[in-house]
């Protein structure tokens, strides 16, 4: 089933504005709202980094229908996974079961500042993620949990306030190894757009399917979510210029994973020409043109499309998107 969501740009706006945008997303008919959990933003000038775990309950109180998820949170360094399990259990009760825990293996930018540690290689980050998910789920379903893993330990731990149905866990992946794990262990899978369709058709989606089948599920049992970077505006020049703030998205994964300050991230990003920045985005001023570039993701097997608009006028984006693009997307699904 096609679902359409909105990405609240926590690196670009303060928490109160973001709540209003989430409310507006529900009003215009979207199905979900998502937020990243950064300690530091990707830009120093004009950057923001409100705390997702405070923002999500505020959105839950102001909305009635939309799902509310993290895209994504790292439950392995800044946080003890047990605290994340407790927080999301509480938020699930407050929201009547509408929250989603979207997780990833993290970036140095958000973790080094609060730990001072050396940023580990992928092998350790992935191992920590797997262990944290196991621990979190055990706390949601068991009492008096005793857990001793390679990285975390619990002694007679119990979450007293938890929902009858555990919170869905969505796992972010940029390559086939983690995508296979997401298909096997996740209720959902998260990826981002703009990296060449072969990545999705030849690597990510086959890996999700393989992982799901290994767990005796079908790929349809996994909510296959993608953040689509869409700069849509009826004024094409505005649509192009709106991408500039998000130049850090055009840095390589290696660059982003090793950067430890917003100032350095901004410096690297500002060296990029606008044409290179815009390549990560679908830049469109015509709804048919936008849908034509979105449809390949649906054809690849992704079913939950979460739209991230880069401009500073999010009310304008939500209004134009919902009036021009959303009806055409619904017609496809």
From Swiss-Prot:
<feature type="binding site">
    <location>
        <position position="37"/>
    </location>
    <ligand>
        <name>coenzyme F420-(gamma-Glu)n</name>
    </ligand>
</feature>
<feature type="binding site">
    <location>
        <position position="192"/>
    </location>
    <ligand>
        <name>substrate</name>
    </ligand>
</feature>
<feature type="binding site">
    <location>
        <position position="280"/>
    </location>
    <ligand>
        <name>substrate</name>
    </ligand>
</feature>
<dbReference type="GO" id="GO:0070967">
    <property type="term" value="F:coenzyme F420 binding"/>
</dbReference>
<comment type="subunit">
    <text>Homodimer.</text>
</comment>
<dbReference type="InterPro" id="IPR011251">
    <property type="entry name" value="Luciferase-like_dom"/>
</dbReference>
<feature type="binding site">
    <location>
        <position position="74"/>
    </location>
    <ligand>
        <name>coenzyme F420-(gamma-Glu)n</name>
    </ligand>
</feature>
<dbReference type="InterPro" id="IPR050564">
    <property type="entry name" value="F420-G6PD/mer"/>
</dbReference>
<dbReference type="InterPro" id="IPR019944">
    <property type="entry name" value="F420-dep_G6P_DH"/>
</dbReference>
<protein>
    <recommendedName>
        <fullName>F420-dependent glucose-6-phosphate dehydrogenase</fullName>
        <ecNumber>1.1.98.2</ecNumber>
    </recommendedName>
</protein>
<feature type="binding site">
    <location>
        <position position="256"/>
    </location>
    <ligand>
        <name>substrate</name>
    </ligand>
</feature>
<comment type="function">
    <text>Catalyzes the coenzyme F420-dependent oxidation of glucose 6-phosphate (G6P) to 6-phosphogluconolactone.</text>
</comment>
<keyword id="KW-0560">Oxidoreductase</keyword>
<feature type="active site" description="Proton donor">
    <location>
        <position position="38"/>
    </location>
</feature>
<dbReference type="GO" id="GO:0005975">
    <property type="term" value="P:carbohydrate metabolic process"/>
</dbReference>
<dbReference type="GO" id="GO:0052749">
    <property type="term" value="F:glucose-6-phosphate dehydrogenase (coenzyme F420) activity"/>
</dbReference>
<feature type="binding site">
    <location>
        <position position="110"/>
    </location>
    <ligand>
        <name>coenzyme F420-(gamma-Glu)n</name>
    </ligand>
</feature>
<dbReference type="InterPro" id="IPR019945">
    <property type="entry name" value="F420_G6P_DH-rel"/>
</dbReference>
<dbReference type="InterPro" id="IPR036661">
    <property type="entry name" value="Luciferase-like_sf"/>
</dbReference>
<feature type="binding site">
    <location>
        <begin position="177"/>
        <end position="178"/>
    </location>
    <ligand>
        <name>coenzyme F420-(gamma-Glu)n</name>
    </ligand>
</feature>
<dbReference type="Pfam" id="PF00296">
    <property type="entry name" value="Bac_luciferase"/>
</dbReference>
<comment type="similarity">
    <text>Belongs to the F420-dependent glucose-6-phosphate dehydrogenase family.</text>
</comment>
<dbReference type="GO" id="GO:0016705">
    <property type="term" value="F:oxidoreductase activity, acting on paired donors, with incorporation or reduction of molecular oxygen"/>
</dbReference>
<feature type="binding site">
    <location>
        <position position="195"/>
    </location>
    <ligand>
        <name>substrate</name>
    </ligand>
</feature>
<feature type="binding site">
    <location>
        <begin position="105"/>
        <end position="106"/>
    </location>
    <ligand>
        <name>coenzyme F420-(gamma-Glu)n</name>
    </ligand>
</feature>
<feature type="active site" description="Proton acceptor">
    <location>
        <position position="107"/>
    </location>
</feature>
<keyword id="KW-0119">Carbohydrate metabolism</keyword>
<feature type="binding site">
    <location>
        <begin position="174"/>
        <end position="175"/>
    </location>
    <ligand>
        <name>coenzyme F420-(gamma-Glu)n</name>
    </ligand>
</feature>
């Amino acid at each position: 089933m096609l679902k359409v969501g909105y990405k609240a740009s926590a690196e670009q706006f303060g928490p109160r504005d973001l709540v209003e945008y989430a409310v507006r997303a529900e009003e215009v008919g979207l199905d979900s709202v998502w937020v990243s959990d950064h300690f530091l933003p990707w830009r120093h000038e004009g950057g923001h980094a409100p705390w997702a775990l405070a923002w999500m309950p505020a959105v839950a109180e102001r909305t009635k229908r939309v799902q509310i998820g993290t895209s994504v949170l790292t439950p392995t360094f800044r946080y003890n996974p047990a605290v994340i399990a407790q927080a999301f259990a509480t938020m699930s009760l407050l929201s009547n079961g509408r929250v989603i825990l979207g997780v990833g293996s993290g970036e140095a930018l958000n973790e080094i500042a609060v730990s001072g540690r050396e940023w580990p290689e992928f092998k350790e980050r992935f191992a920590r993620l797997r262990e944290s998910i196991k621990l979190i789920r055990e706390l949601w379903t068991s009492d008096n949990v005793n857990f001793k893993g390679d990285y975390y330990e619990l002694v007679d731990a119990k979450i007293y306030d938890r929902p009858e149905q555990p919170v869905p866990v969505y796992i972010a992946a940029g390559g086939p190894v983690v995508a296979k794990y997401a298909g096997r262990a996740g209720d959902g899978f998260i990826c981002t757009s703009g990296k060449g369709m072969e990545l999705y058709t030849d690597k990510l989606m086959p890996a999700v399917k393989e992982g799901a089948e290994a767990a005796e599920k079908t790929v349809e049992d996994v909510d296959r979510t993608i953040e689509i970077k869409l700069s849509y505006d009826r004024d094409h020049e505005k649509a192009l210029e709106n991408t500039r703030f998000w130049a850090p998205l055009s840095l390589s994964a290696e660059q982003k994973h090793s950067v430890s300050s917003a100032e350095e991230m901004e410096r690297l990003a500002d060296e990029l020409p606008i044409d290179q920045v815009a390549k990560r985005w679908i830049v469109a001023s015509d709804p048919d043109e936008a849908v034509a570039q979105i449809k390949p993701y649906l054809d690849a097997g992704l079913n939950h499309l979460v739209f991230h608009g880069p401009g500073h006028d999010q009310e304008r984006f939500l209004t134009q998107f919902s009036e021009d693009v959303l009806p055409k997307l619904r017609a496809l699904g």
